[in-house]
């Protein structure tokens, strides 16, 4: 007669192995999405390569989903990269109110241009734009160019979708949370 404890143990081991495999696949998927978002950013924004070179850290959210009907919210998973390597996973959330209807997604990239700004961001458990620090959202200038030499802000942000850079948008009120495990493995 088979031992029920052995069956349960084997089942738990099998589930654990499946979940570990799925977590690895999910992490790989997010890492691939982050890499694709950075490549897309460097194609769509002419000054991106110079800004990437100057940044001490880059927070990349490949897809932030926004939905609303008067009251709205957004959520997305991403990664903090330093010198092109992922050092921590993050989640962003936001709430908004006003005229809004529907669901959309967008890519958000936040660049830390000073070590002090990056250290302050990383030191807390949560960080809110507009309260813990300001993010200067960059829009195209005259002739669709960005003057990288005159950017003095310690934290700059870009919001774009598959059509390109989005205008008149803000990251104010967005909250950023460290995710100890890979977001999809939770």
Task: Name the predicted role of every residue range.
Residues 1-11:
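Bacterial N-terminal signal peptides that target proteins for export
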Residues 26-186:
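Small-residue-enriched, tightly packed secondary-structure blocks
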Residues 9-20:
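Bacterial N-terminal signal peptides
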Residues 22-24:
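Signal peptide processing junction and immediate N-terminal pro/mature segment
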């Amino acid at each position: 007669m088979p031992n029920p404890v052995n069956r349960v143990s084997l089942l738990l081991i099998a589930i654990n192995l499946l979940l570990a495999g799925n977590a690895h696949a999910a992490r790989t998927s997010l890492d691939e999405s982050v890499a694709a978002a950075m490549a897309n950013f460097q194609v769509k924004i002419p000054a991106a390569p110079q800004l990437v070179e100057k940044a001490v850290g880059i927070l990349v959210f490949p897809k932030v989903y926004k939905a609303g009907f008067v009251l709205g919210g957004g959520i997305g998973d991403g990664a903090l990269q330093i010198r092109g390597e992922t050092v921590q996973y993050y989640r962003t959330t936001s709430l908004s109110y006003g005229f809004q209807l529907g669901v959309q997604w967008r890519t958000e990239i936040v660049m830390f241009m000073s070590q002090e700004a990056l250290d302050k961001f990383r030191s807390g458990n949560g960080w809110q734009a507009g309260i813990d620090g300001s993010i200067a959202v960059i829009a195209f200038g005259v002739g669709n160019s960005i003057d990288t030499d005159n950017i003095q802000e310690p934290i700059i942000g870009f919001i774009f979708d598959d059509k390109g850079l989005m205008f008149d948008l803000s990251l104010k009120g967005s909250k950023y949370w460290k995710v100890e495990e890979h977001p999809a493995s939770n």
